[in-house]
Curated annotation (Swiss-Prot):
The encoding gene: rpsP
Cellular component terms (Gene Ontology): cytoplasm; small ribosomal subunit
GO biological process entries: translation
Family named by the database record: Belongs to the bacterial ribosomal protein bS16 family.
Gene3D superfamilies: 3.30.1320.10
PANTHER family, alphabetized: 30S RIBOSOMAL PROTEIN S16, SMALL RIBOSOMAL SUBUNIT PROTEIN BS16M
GO MF annotation list: structural constituent of ribosome
Protein name in UniProt: Small ribosomal subunit protein bS16
HAMAP family per record: Ribosomal_bS16
One Pfam family per UniProt: Ribosomal_S16
InterPro entries hit by this protein: Ribosomal_bS16 (IPR000307), Ribosomal_bS16_dom_sf (IPR023803)
Length: 112
């Protein structure tokens, strides 16, 4: 059973928003899912992304494969960086949070 992290379409015609879900790769796009880990709303300006980082990292460590769109969200939010810090050398959770916060601040400065 292959597990995917993907978008599930919600909303009405031309006003779609998406929930980020973990599901079996064989289930339909809007069908049964294992867990909801966030949402994406492209209708707001700027768009809104909310992801439960701990759940996302947990599923990535278990081997779930994100789709291309979800992977780009994870890269923007620093989820892959947190997974890298957790799987590497043993460091405390406070140090992980400090490094993640510094990474996000550096990213904000670069994009201004």
């Amino acid at each position: 059973m292959s597990i995917k992290i993907r978008l599930q379409r919600k909303g009405r015609k031309k006003k779609a928003f998406y929930t980020i879900v973990v599901s079996n790769s064989r289930s339909p796009r809007n069908g049964k899912f294992l867990e909801k880990i966030g949402f994406y709303n492209p209708n707001t300006n700027p768009y809104t992304i909310s992801i439960n980082v701990d759940k996302a990292v947990n599923w990535l460590i278990k081997g779930a494969q994100p789709t291309c769109t979800v992977k780009s969200f994870f890269l923007k939010e620093g989820i892959y960086y947190k997974k890298y810090l957790l799987s590497g050398v043993k460091i405390s959770k406070s140090e992980i949070e400090q490094k993640l916060k510094a990474w996000k601040e550096k990213k904000i400065i670069l994009h201004k």
